[in-house]
Regions:
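C-terminal beta-strand-loop-alpha-helix "lid" module of Rossmann-like NAD(P)-dependent dehydrogenases
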Residues: 1-292
């Protein structure tokens, strides 16, 4: 097979790959917009729920043994991490950075509750801290999935299986960068649930809690927590799509550069082949004339 034909086949192969990377970029862009829109649709509700909790907390009597606030076993806490990875790869170092961050902060006796197939597969046969029966998808976060995860987390804390639960996920810092972060889910910290200064549109007067503050708090605290989890899942999903867009954009640009270089090489090879053919034709014609 001629050199020019091989070059042409390579160019066509890279062009096909470039179509795939460009399509993946567009798909991730669409998913990113939808995820952000979904979160914007529900975030006012969870913001209002947080405001409501902050108005209830000051009325709670001190009850250090309550599972939502009690910091048990401070010397050697039974700690779990809710780890939000992706279901798919081809997103640059998105999953690797998150798992590296997790290993740097986790202790040998901690437990990993992993969301996303990439993280689950990476830890399944390599890390005994993975809770294998805990399996959830990271694709297209939903309120129901966040609610189910919240119920599991609260049950494990109430039953005494765990003392602390943290969420580990990737947070978008700006349009170009994102980094892994860790936030505590349970026990709740009263310092971060204090009421903000009242604005002009805020309700005035004392809050009446029926039948009592603890009963009201226990009803709305799980909603607040599943809002935290849904927000982290959505933020993580958006960071994944952003990372994949960056990776696919870089791959598409690299493919363009390769095609340009190969096209130049193909043109030189083709030009040399044509020149050689012309030379052979001229030489053959001269030989015929000499014979005649």
């Amino acid at each position: 097979m001629s050199s020019s034909k091989l070059l042409k086949e390579r160019i066509e192969s890279i062009q096909d790959t470039m179509k795939i990377t460009n399509a993946m970029y567009l798909i991730s862009s669409s998913k990113l917009r939808k995820a952000r829109q979904n979160y914007q649709n529900v975030s006012p509700y969870f913001n209002r729920m947080r405001d409501t909790i902050s108005r209830v907390v000051p009325h709670l009597p001190e009850e250090p043994e309550h599972p939502f606030f009690h910091e048990r076993n401070l010397e050697n806490p039974r700690r779990a991490y809710l780890v939000l990875t992706a279901d798919k790869g081809m997103a640059g170092a998105y999953n690797q950075n998150l798992l590296k961050f997790l290993r740097e902060h986790a202790d040998p006796n901690d437990r990993f509750y992993v969301i996303g197939q990439v993280g689950y597969r990476a830890l399944r046969h390599r890390d005994p801290r993975l809770v294998e029966e805990f399996r959830y998808s990271a694709t297209a976060p939903t309120l129901q999935r966040a609610r189910d995860i919240t119920v599991d987390a609260i049950d494990d804390c109430k039953s005494g299986k765990l003392d602390e639960i943290y969420i580990v996920y990737t947070k978008i810092q700006n349009a170009l960068t994102s980094e892994p972060v860790m936030e505590r889910l349970l026990p709740l910290d009263r310092r971060f649930l204090q009421p903000a200064p009242k604005g002009l549109g805020d309700p005035k007067g004392e809050v009446e809690l029926v039948p009592d503050a603890w009963t009201v708090f226990e009803q709305i605290a799980p909603i607040y927590m599943h809002g935290m989890i849904f927000g982290a899942m959505t933020e993580s999903f958006c960071a994944e799509q952003s990372a994949r867009m960056t990776a696919m954009d870089s791959a598409t640009k690299s493919a363009n550069d390769m095609i340009r270089d190969l096209q130049l090489e193909y043109n030189r090879t083709r030009q040399g082949s044509i020149t050689q053919e012309i030379t052979e034709i001229i030489g053959g014609a001269a030989a015929v004339q000499d014979r005649s």
